[in-house]
Amino acid sequence: MNQTAINRADVRTRFIFDDMPVRGLHVRLENVWQHIVKQKNYPAAIRRALGELLAAGVLLSGNLKNEGTLIVQVQGQGRLKMLVAEATSDRTVRATARWDETAEIADDESLGDLLGEGGVFVLTLQPKDGEPWQGVVPLEGDGIAQMLVNYMKRSEQLDTHIVLSASDEAAGGLLVQRLPEEVLDEEAWEHVSTLARTLTAEELAGLDAQHVLYRLFHETPPRVFEPETFEFSCTCSRGKVSDMLLMLGGEEVGGVVVEQGSIEVDCDFCHSKYVFDETDVNALFGEDVVGVAKGLPRHTVQ
């Protein structure tokens, strides 16, 4: 269901250095982030990792060349099963996590410990027009930021530095990157990336772009572009759930309705509930699939 939460503090800000081929993005999400964390009772360690991934998704979506959706996922076999964040070219976001809710999770646990062995990072591009693209790589690095830096260096072969942070109040991120096909003095890049490394998690989550960029680069100030506002919006719908049920097939869906009386599907992102009873399911498939599951003769329904 299309739910929206808007705040002018939920912005992404682009910047570029005129005297060196380096670009950057800053993001700070406040109301959007608070809206997301209210959907579930996230353990602190998972909440922090999800906020960092959300900020990372908004940063990376700044480089989308076509209209569409960028999806970043972290998947594992441990107590944390999945983190996922989506950011669109329309500047909407959503995010959620799945984990073993019976397991004990300490506030300071690392992402690697939560994911266990065999963790992977998945980046998916879903253009509005054209075929989707997906990249899957093993997790490399301690934390979301280092994992993304390693991924981008491997895939784009561009020097990149990323800082991410998430508190109860806000999620934030900073990305600085060499411009492609441009020559940059190693000392100049080291200077910029070293300054970026001095940014603390508290500053990133608590300060807006103007204060962050001044704090880091006041001696060589970048050119800053107009901020872009983001909002929470969930794209779930009854129609999409119907399509999913059709893919499962009438035999399986009819059997579930016989056993449970109806099918209820909850959206992981916004907690909207979609209920399909016997009448709904039969109308969806155009035949009495529930009756067939009960052993009755097959017949169509109008």
Curated annotation (Swiss-Prot):
Q: Which GO terms describe its biological process?
A: protein refolding
Give the protein's recorded name: 33 kDa chaperonin
Q: Which PANTHER family match?
A: 33 KDA CHAPERONIN (PTHR30111:SF1)
Which InterPro entries does UniProt cross-reference here?
A: Heat_shock_Hsp33, Heat_shock_Hsp33_C, Heat_shock_Hsp33_N, Hsp33_helix_hairpin_bin_dom_sf
Q: What this chain does, per the record?
A: Redox regulated molecular chaperone. Protects both thermally unfolding and oxidatively damaged proteins from irreversible aggregation. Plays an important role in the bacterial defense system toward oxidative stress.
PTM comment text: Under oxidizing conditions two disulfide bonds are formed involving the reactive cysteines. Under reducing conditions zinc is bound to the reactive cysteines and the protein is inactive.
GO CC annotations on file: cytoplasm
Q: Could you tell me which cysteines form disulfide bridges?
A: 234-236, 267-270
Family from the record: Belongs to the HSP33 family.
Recall the GO molecular function terms of this protein's record: protein folding chaperone; unfolded protein binding
Gene3D superfamilies in UniProt: helix hairpin bin, Hsp33 domain, HSP33 redox switch-like
Keyword Cell inner membrane set for record: no
In terms of one coarse class, where is the protein primarily found? cytoplasm
Q: Which gene encodes it?
A: hslO
Q: Where in the cell is it found?
A: Cytoplasm
Q: Which domain of life is it from?
A: Bacteria
* Organism encoding this protein: Neisseria meningitidis serogroup A / serotype 4A (strain DSM 15465 / Z2491)
